[in-house]
């Protein structure tokens, strides 16, 4: 029981923070579901409430660390009761008085003599104890309070957003408004390359050419057989491909003319000008004529498809003439482009990029205008601070004159009125 009474612990009563009263926003956020989330407008209030909880927790932590340190020191020095007694007197503020060794009274003149006697060893023991007490009587080390850097780090992170605008930042905004040199490259449409079937066919022929060249090196016989194929170049490959396409690219109806030429001829030919075959009489053909015609015609000539030269150039000329006469609308781009999904997506993204660039440019111009206005306000605020200093100087001079029990001079009064009027004019400019 005596040890419990001598315990230096204070047993602080920690008061918990009432979250409902002091942190209502924090309590409301905890009661929400995960899908609701936190709004941007709630962040400032949440920050203040979290700082309140942090300060309360750090305060309790410091008190607990102090109690732990006191308990540790008390356990280390628990065996020495006299030290505890001296420690209590030291805590109460009473000066520590060490008892002096009592001198042995001697009768007569020999009282001051330092002769051998039983009191001599006793004084030595007392002095040794006093030195021991003085050595061990150290004040209790005050626990070091942990440094709370959270507010300092917070304000250091916020400072760049609240600091004054400088000329370097204005220059950065002006540089951002300059049109980049490569902006036009983003709106260019690359030319349409070859179709994959043509490209693959050309690659196959080139591969065969390389294989033939390798095979030709192995023997003279193979070289004689594959020699013409090995000597082909890229131009010869293209000519071969065009030739094969022209051979296989025959219209279904066997007509060599283009669709526009056929449509034009169909529009010019009048309908029902030929009588039906059933009503028209069949002319009789003489034997000579039939014989000569039969001899002149052959099955091979009948199976040969009809061909006419310069059909493609005729198609192009007819189209140009119809466009010049206004009978046909000109297309800005080929008809195949409308079916090109890649080109349509590219044009769509380019339009979005152009709209986004215009929006960003407008916002940058607005930001530059606001920054320049804020620079002017900063200069006015600096002038207001200088005017405040002048007003305070004039006020101090007038107060010093009154303390010396003399009336302020006319110069001091005029200086004070001038500073006040100048300050009012600057404030009007700042408010306006």
Swiss-Prot record:
Region (Disordered), start-end ranges: 90-124, 275-315
One Pfam family hit: Ada3
Cysteine pairs bridged by disulfides in the record: none
Main location group: nucleus
GO BP annotations listed: regulation of transcription by RNA polymerase II
Highest taxon, organism lineage: Eukaryota
A GO MF label: transcription coactivator activity
Keyword Transcription regulation: yes
Positions with biased composition (Polar residues): 293-305
Subcellular location: Nucleus
Cellular-component GO terms for this entry: nucleus; SAGA complex
Coiled-coil features, chain-numbered ranges: 335-398
Protein's UniProt keywords contain Transmembrane helix: no
InterPro entries in the cross-refs: Histone_AcTrfase_su3
UniProt keyword annotations, A-Z: Coiled coil, Nucleus, Transcription, Transcription regulation
PANTHER family from the UniProt entry: TRANSCRIPTIONAL ADAPTER 3, TRANSCRIPTIONAL ADAPTER 3-RELATED
Protein family: Belongs to the NGG1 family.
Function: Functions as a component of the PCAF complex. The PCAF complex is capable of efficiently acetylating histones in a nucleosomal context.
Protein name: Transcriptional adapter 3-B
UniProt source species: Xenopus laevis (African clawed frog)
Chain's gene name: tada3-b
